[in-house]
Regions:
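N-terminal signal peptide c-region/cleavage motif recognized by signal peptidases
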Residues: 14-16
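Short, linear, compositionally biased motifs with a strong N-terminal bias
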Residues: 10-11
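N-terminal, motif-rich segments that launch catalysis or mediate targeting to/interaction with membranes
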Residues: 18-128, 135-265
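Positively charged n-region of N-terminal signal peptides that target proteins for export
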Residues: 1-4
Length: 265
């Protein structure tokens, strides 16, 4: 599985929040569940009251459109405009995907935080770690993360963001989310270690670099057909795999002292 070793892979004002579509988020959560340590799994089960991470994987996409959780709308993405370095991207005062991930980690790490706050943080982080790995959720504010980029998918009108959310996922493999998990999550322990190295910001930079490459290779009017599906499906496989392993890693670092100690924490 050498294609999954971390390397420079090909290296949004209101933006569509549906990163990966339902299946992609389910895949991320399913992979993460597979890599929770027993201590972490017990903690997650307690916080989610016996429901799975997959059960909650897509909850935030709907919740963000309700008055109660409208404040989370900007937490699904981070805007990195063309020619702007990740470190120089202006901060969104309402928050973005990276600041939101860090905030949920802080809440989940606080044993004194109210249970309801920790449960909400779990539901949120299960989703937005996946969002961060959808490259166009690190896209340009000027085109709403590809939502304004008009392309075609097998001859039908589409936008670049929707193509990456679900069209290529569905065209690449006719698998259920559990089949996706079983087929792409076949890395060695050494490869798994490489995947989780780095920080949330390091991982976000990787997604932003992929987004920049997508923009370069996909001018407006591009018709995505078999060649494009063949080109981009391995990238999607990698991003979903990384998202699942990294989500598990973040939770293991919080809930399993022995795991954290193995990383010098």
């Amino acid at each position: 599985m050498k294609r999954f070793i971390i390397a420079p892979l090909l290296c949004l004002t209101a933006i569509s929040a549906l990163a990966w579509g339902q299946k992609g988020h389910d895949v991320t959560a399913a992979i993460a569940e597979k890599h929770l340590t027993p201590a972490t799994k017990a903690a997650v089960d307690s916080i989610l009251e016996g429901q799975s991470m997959v059960y909650w994987a897509n909850w935030l996409d709907n919740a963000s459109h309700t008055p109660q959780y409208a404040y989370t709308k900007t937490w699904h993405y981070k805007n990195i405009d063309e020619g702007v370095r990740y470190e120089e991207a202006p901060a969104n005062p309402a928050g973005d995907v990276t600041t939101a991930i860090k905030a949920q980690i802080e809440t989940l790490s606080d044993p004194k935080a109210p249970f309801a706050d920790r449960q909400l943080a779990m539901k949120i982080i299960v989703h937005i770690v996946g969002d961060m790995h959808q490259p166009l959720h690190m896209g340009h504010a000027t085109d709403l993360g590809g939502n304004r980029n008009k392309v075609r998918f097998f001859g039908r009108d589409a936008n670049l963001h929707s193509v990456w959310d679900s069209n290529i996922v569905e065209a690449g493999h006719k698998w259920s989310y559990s089949e996706w998990r079983d087929q792409i999550d076949r890395v060695s322990p050494e490869e798994a270690q490489a995947i989780v190295d780095g920080s949330v910001d390091d991982w976000a930079k990787q997604s932003a670099a992929i987004a920049a490459n997508i923009y370069r290779q996909t001018p407006d009017g591009t018709n995505h057909s078999y060649d494009e599906v063949a080109t981009w499906t391995p990238v999607i496989e990698t991003q979903l795999l990384y998202a699942g392993h990294r989500l598990a890693h973040l939770l293991n670092m919080i809930y399993d002292p022995a795991y954290a100690a193995s990383f010098g924490k």
